[in-house]
Swiss-Prot record:
Domain SCP2: 15-112
Assembly information from the UniProt record: Component of the Ubi complex metabolon, which regroups five ubiquinone biosynthesis proteins (UbiE, UbiF, UbiG, UbiH and UbiI) and two accessory factors (UbiK and the lipid-binding protein UbiJ). Interacts with UbiK and forms a complex composed of 2 UbiK subunits and 1 UbiJ subunit. The UbiK-UbiJ complex interacts with palmitoleic acid.
Chief localisation class: cytoplasm
Organism: Escherichia coli (strain K12)
InterPro entries: SCP2_sterol-bd_dom, SCP2_sterol-bd_dom_sf, UbiJ
Family, similarity comment: Belongs to the UbiJ family.
GO biological process: ubiquinone biosynthetic process
Pathway participation: Cofactor biosynthesis; ubiquinone biosynthesis
Name of the encoding gene: ubiJ
Role description: Required for ubiquinone (coenzyme Q) biosynthesis under aerobic conditions. Binds hydrophobic ubiquinone biosynthetic intermediates via its SCP2 domain and is essential for the stability of the Ubi complex. May constitute a docking platform where Ubi enzymes assemble and access their SCP2-bound polyprenyl substrates.
Cell compartments where the protein resides: Cytoplasm
Keyword annotations: Cytoplasm, Ubiquinone biosynthesis
Designated name of the protein: Ubiquinone biosynthesis accessory factor UbiJ
Length: 201
């Protein structure tokens, strides 16, 4: 089976599970009814097209028609779209580029913000509520532990490179070097102006 249909089917299943399961989200979903959102991930040659209908969202790899809105961003930016307060900041910083009707992406972000992404709800039909909650807690704890471990290792490597091995300058050394370079540049400019004045006489 080709990779692209497998990815689109997985994303479609995930979005439908979280965005179309709860009846409480019906009003938020109705704002997207009939809209087409194209998501282009920088670094990948293909894009994902989200077609919203009353009962589900279809995720397609190809779409012949025009999209109501096109979102262009790196893959690392897409998870930040769950928080609707970050949308404006992402657009202003240039991390997220929006072409077309911005209302479509705003409504999608609002819907994603309202939806509760809880892995325990996915596991509950198969394992029961208590086991699903325990597994979910263990997964969250493991992810947090892993995240802190990675951050700690990054800090250790950065300190080793700058302090112990002296392979790279520290932040204060870089700032000092930048100030000294700017001072030399100003002195050269002043000297050049003085020489030009002397040559003009």
């Amino acid at each position: 089976m080709p990779f692209k249909p497998l990815v689109t089917a997985g994303i479609e299943s995930l979005l439908n599970t979280f965005l179309y399961r709860s009846p409480a989200l019906k009003t938020a979903r109705s704002r997207l009814l009939g809209k087409v959102l194209r998501v282009e991930v920088k670094g990948f040659s293909t894009s994902l097209i989200l077609v919203f209908s009353e009962r589900q969202v279809d995720v397609l790899g190809e779409w012949a028609g025009d999209a109501d809105c096109t979102v262009i961003a790196y893959a690392s930016v897409l998870p930040k779209l769950r928080d609707r307060q970050q949308l404006t900041a992402l657009i202003r910083s240039g991390e997220l580029e929006v072409q077309g009707d911005i209302q479509v992406v705003q409504n999608f972000v609002a819907l994603a913000d309202l939806a509760e992404f809880d892995p325990a709800e996915l596991l509950a039909p198969y394992t029961g509520d208590i086991a699903a909650e325990g597994i979910s807690k263990a997964m969250r704890g493991g992810a947090k532990f892993l995240h802190h471990g990675i951050k700690r290792q990054q800090r250790y490597v950065a300190e080793a490179i700058t302090e112990e091995w002296r392979m790279a300058p520290g932040p204060l050394e870089v700032a000092w070097f930048a100030e000294e370079t700017a001072a030399v540049e100003r002195a050269v400019d002043a000297l050049t102006k003085r020489l030009e004045k002397l040559e003009a006489k």
